């Protein structure tokens, strides 16, 4: 399956923006529009299990890196600039380590390249309980 995105512009120079946990590409629309005016094609990507992209029980950075590779190949993007915020930063770091020749530039925002313990599980559990009560 292919990740959902909003694409702004039609330049040969592509910037792919990946949002943080519980976000979507829409979080970056204002910045995306400004970068588009600078002559770039902007891809505001909804990562797996977020926004309008597909949802799966499988969820890790290896899978998200592979999702990004499929997206880049599908859209025939050459030498993209990658911007990743928080969880998106981890995704683009993983991707860049695996496919360094496919990346022109990398910008990682609000996360560092280290191991983080799982700490969002209580939020996810609460959201699942809320959905059960709504149903």
Predicted feature locations:
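Short aromatic-enriched loop/helix-cap "lid" or pocket-rim segments at secondary-structure transitions
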Residues: 55-57, 117-121
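Conserved hydrolase catalytic core segment
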Residues: 78-117
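Conserved small/polar residues in nucleotide/adenosyl-binding loops
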Residues: 132-134
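Active-site loop/oxyanion-hole signature of alpha/beta-hydrolase fold enzymes
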Residues: 37, 43-83
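A short loop-to-beta-strand scaffold at the N-terminal edge of the catalytic core in hydrolase folds
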Residues: 1-7
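Conserved HGGG/HGGXW glycine-rich cap/lid loop of the alpha/beta-hydrolase fold
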Residues: 7-54
